[in-house]
Amino acid sequence: MKKTFIFLYCVVLFISTTLAVEMKKTQDFNLRIFDQHPKYNNNFEPENGVLTVNLVKSILNETTGIPELTTMSNLTTVNKQGRIYSPELFKYFFADNSDAPDRNNSGKNYPLDITLTMNLDDKSNYFYDNQEFFPIDGRGFDVDQQFRNYYDDESKANPKPYHNYHFCAKITNSRFTYKGFETFRFVGDDDVWVFIDRKLVVDLGGLHIAQEKTIDLTKLGLVVNKLYVIDFFYCERHTSRSTIRIETTIELQCPWYDFCGVCTGNGLSCCNVTRDCDDGNPCTIDLCPEPTAVFDLKDISANCRHQDRTPTDWSVTDKCNTGKCNVSTGIFVTNITKCIPQNSCKAEDHCDSGLGCIFKNLCTDVCSTGACVDGKCETKNSKICIDELDKGVEDKCYEYSCDPNVGCTKKPRCLQKSENYNPCLNSFCEVSTGECKNTTIPPNLCDCQCDGKLNKCQIKSCNADGSCKPLPSLEIDDKNPCTIDACDETTGVITHTLSNKCGGCSICNGVTGDCDPVDKKCDDGNRCTTEVCLLDKATNNGNCSSKPTTECDKGDVCMVYSCDTEKGCVETPRVCPSKGKCQVGKCVPGVGCKYEPRVCKADAFCLVAECDEIVGCIQFEKKCAADNGRCQAGICKNATATEEGTCESVDFDPKPFICKTAAVVSVGVAVGVAVGGAIALGVFIFAGKKGYDYWKASQGVTMATSNANPLYESNPSGGENPIYTSPN
């Protein structure tokens, strides 16, 4: 007897000091429900239909996270069979559209949240079974009595109570660690779609009586110990039944909760934008806090977000409007940009919506280049006139200058002046040096009598016979084809008048006499435009034309080239916008913007870091797959300073029914429940078998059979059970 008590003591000590791992008895999930009504969505309460597969695409949209129809035409067979009368409203089956107008077929819905609890059965399946599944009776739209007008089909002959028959529900973004044996079974009506790893695995679309589908996850090519996403979508679209049964061995995990405590929620179950976030400013868009924000719920209003509204009256590329929102009315007031000249070379002209401020160029006189230097018009000097008249090649026998009346001119360097004219000298220029030289003309050829025969515009010259031969003054012809030369015979005043043959931004070429366009005369003071002078050859008139400059673009696809109307070209690295929360934009040289998955880093071995399309990077508890997932739990141990993190397998206690064997009396069989093992044996030690029977009844411990008391069990392996007393 003494040995027996020592043995029992050791068993009690072992049980009381060993970590007990028990299968979760329940799993709670947030069911996001979207109350629908036939008034707002005619895809609800249509004619009875049939089971329709391929109604939705086989891959879940990664950005929206909801199913998409395979076709958007209501004339296709699949949509007709699936009773999708208005395909454009399908997107509101599982997405908030509570702000839609209160009119027929607006797609308006009413989001609600409930908790769905799945229980563990004796076969280690989690199940939910409800053959009268009406979770939002009297809620949503049906708070208003006028919407409570749908009853069971049998209501006339056998009156039954009202129910809310029109709603869709979803459990999305839930995770599970694949253990290698899981199954999923659904029985119910109407539409049901289940996606695992964004791939459609249960396809029970359409209006139909209860249908069944079982999925063996071992057939899906999943990898043991890898984390997967599961998304569940369900709709009830027609009277008179609403049934649902779910059975699964999948152990789901919520990756994150919103500030309302809702799994993968958006915060709208406890935050109402109108009630909680209205800042009274019509120029802002009011939003509830970020879903994963952490704060005391009484401080929701203090954590709301407010974004500035942007104008919709004009294009954001309009360079002339800098409209502001009137905080009193919420109306954007057009504010034309004032174009203020930055220097004395320009005058205000107008604002172009595509180009910005355009200024009038004041540097347009004949001796201005059209350019503005240090705030002043640049004047043509001899060098500029050489460029203009002789294409940059100086003729040393001429002097170049700009005449305010005619523009650039060149005059012979060695020409005798009329007032000192000596007809017996022949003045000429040495071309190579520009040196002036004279040769003497014989007197008989130059010294003739011209007295009284010359007017003020003539000079003395002699014929070979010595008679007078008046010649025009040498200064009358300025050798410029662009001027009209004249001399007053009474006064001797010589004038050179610029011909008006060239107009606008063109000038007359002093060498050829042609009209040449001058782009500089079109400078509009906007550094983001390229100005050209276009010559109309029929009229010899030059017209200015401005267009956005192309000089800023250097061809690097990873740089953004822009232009500031005052500063000129600006270069900034291209920022590729992210796509959703989980695709990061990256610029690849020579290619441009590409997307790559956002990398989220876990802070510990026993945390999983990944990206969620709703909130971005998240971290949550790592679930390890056990060696024998049916009978063991995977336990995660974080890394230490000396050891790496590991996953270990620990037996369930009590063991699930399928794991019990006849080889030994397991702790689970012996005790019934892990936490009560030591108590049960202690009761037996001090109270005997009858005491244990009383304890079992008082605790409500569930046993497989009426003889499940371990005190009645002999060792089937032939050994001695020290706590077994034969009934004989």
Swiss-Prot record:
Protein topology in the membrane: Single-pass type I membrane protein
Stretches that traverse the bilayer: 667-687
Cytoplasmic topological segments: 688-728
Top-level taxon: Eukaryota
Residue ranges of domain PA14 in the record: 118-266
Cellular component GO terms held in the UniProt record: extracellular matrix; extracellular region; membrane
Subcellular location: Membrane
Entry-listed glycosylation sites: 61, 74, 104, 272, 326, 335, 438, 543, 638
InterPro entries tied to this protein: Fibro_Slime, PA14/GLEYA, PA14_dom, Prespore-cell_inducing_factor, S_mold_repeat
Extracellular side: 21-666
UniProt main location, coarse: membrane
Pfam families: Dicty_CTDC, PA14
Signal peptide (UniProt feature, chain positions): 1-20
Sorted UniProt keywords: Glycoprotein, Membrane, Signal, Transmembrane, Transmembrane helix
Membership in a protein family: Belongs to the prespore-cell-inducing factor family.
Name of the featured protein: Protein psiK
Annotated source species: Dictyostelium discoideum (Social amoeba)
